[in-house]
Amino acid sequence: MSFIADKIVMDGLTYDDVLLIPAYSEVLPKTVELSTKFSRNIELKIPFVTAAMDTVTEAKMAIAIAREGGIGVIHKNMSIEEQARQVAIVKRAENGMIYDPVTIKRGSTVADALALMAEYKIGGIPVVDDERYLVGIVTNRDLRFEKDMNKRIDEVMTKENIITTNPTTDMEAVSQILQEHRIEKLPVVDKDNKLVGLITYKDITKAKDKPMACKDSKGRLRVAAGVGVTNDTLERMRALVDAGADAIVIDTAHGHSKGVIEKLKEAKDHFPHIDIVVGNIATGEAAKALVEAGADGVKVGIGPGSICTTRVVAGVGVPQLSAVYDVAKALKGTGIPLIADGGLRYSGDVVKALAAGGYSVMIGSLVAGTEESPGDTIIFNGRKFKSYRGMGSLEAMENGSKDRYFQSGTSDVKKLVPEGIAARVPYKGTLYEVIYQLVGGLRAGMGYCGAANIEKLHDAKFTRITNAGVLESHPHDVSITSEAPNYSRPE
């Protein structure tokens, strides 16, 4: 009997411990298929999910990643009403047809219209009566020079010769109508002139510009939202579902626990028709328990994040590559996808995470420095940075994430035990620029492995490397004179 034989049950490997072995390939990087699954019923065009962190994903980030083909998870460090509002902003950002357009009553004022336009970031609003019959439309042009904020909308709206269409008109015909009449908004009405939707020229052009966008069956951008395990979880979920959330992520530090499993079962009883992803976990046993309880997806990663201190504070975790592989083995044949969450520094790590069995990766630090992240902008030593913090940091826990680390009953900040830190990351430009490089690296890796799609990438093989192999993998014996957009030296 020995300690190693009795207590060490597995080797723990992470991304720097291995490299993928190149294989015979008939696949060009530009031809690989990147579509995958986020959850049981939600497909992505690219395997990238932005993290439910208060310095990573709010509406602006969720819109940007969905337009690229991924999905964002809006964090829960805000009121129920505000989180639902963030979801609604994403769902209204882009539509084939807006089925529940923002409207205004004919007796409302100019001030009311301007407030709605500012809240929803829109430039025009259909005007309806109490029965939702269309009586006019008011746009920025109607209000631009109006000084009387108390004037009734029906005094300034366009009410004559309103161009409309019916629900059966196809998008090509809609484009012709908009161009022919030089209008940007086209109300959709039924045979009785009752408003049933709205089509905008902006949405049509967006659809053409971003054909890979991740959208639902109504042409709206997809978005997920995070919840914790608290007394108001179901109330929060109801508000998020009503706002249009496509999936809910039950986000905790330890998903393989009684309280989380019971909350999952309760949530599935109340919301059987919406996908619920649960995390975080690090073992196949945990994955089986969550799937048995009804999970539509699982999130893998305990402690690998750049701002996470769980492994050193609690002494707990599984190196990320091994965790992903162990969960992937357990999920084989279930149809339930896994999200590899954390530990990613380069695009090559993304390829490794997917090759180990991931269907998508959750990214935090890689995108926290982008224009679309909600983190504060910081100037330090003449360089631009953005704030980035773990949801287990003291600052985030004070703002609402205590329940993620099972400390919701602690009111004294001095008695909180953080499992994360607050930091800063270099400003990186737009999300599009970052995703472009990550996707490019993923395509290259799949080409080297001869993998035409992510399912085939799961068959790729690894070689274990030494510390010398890691050093050899990075630029060495030179001074970098021109930085690449997809590489910086590890700190």
Predicted segment positions?
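Alpha/beta catalytic cores of nucleotide-metabolism and tRNA/nucleoside-modifying enzymes
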Residues: 1-24, 104-105, 166, 226, ...
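Active-site-adjacent beta->alpha loops and helix N-cap segments on the catalytic face
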Residues: 30, 79-88, 146-150, 194-214, ...
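Bateman/CBS regulatory modules and CBS-like beta-alpha motifs in cytosolic regions of diverse proteins
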Residues: 30-44, 51-53, 82-120, 127-129, ...
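Short beta-strand/loop segments at the ligand-binding rim of alpha/beta enzyme cores
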Residues: 43-50, 96-101, 216-226, 267-282, ...
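Catalytic cores of alpha/beta
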Residues: 60-63, 235-243, 282-300, 340, ...
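Catalytic beta/alpha-barrel core
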Residues: 73-77, 103-104, 124-126, 164-165, ...
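Short beta->alpha transition motifs characteristic of CBS
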Residues: 74-79, 122, 126, 133-149, ...
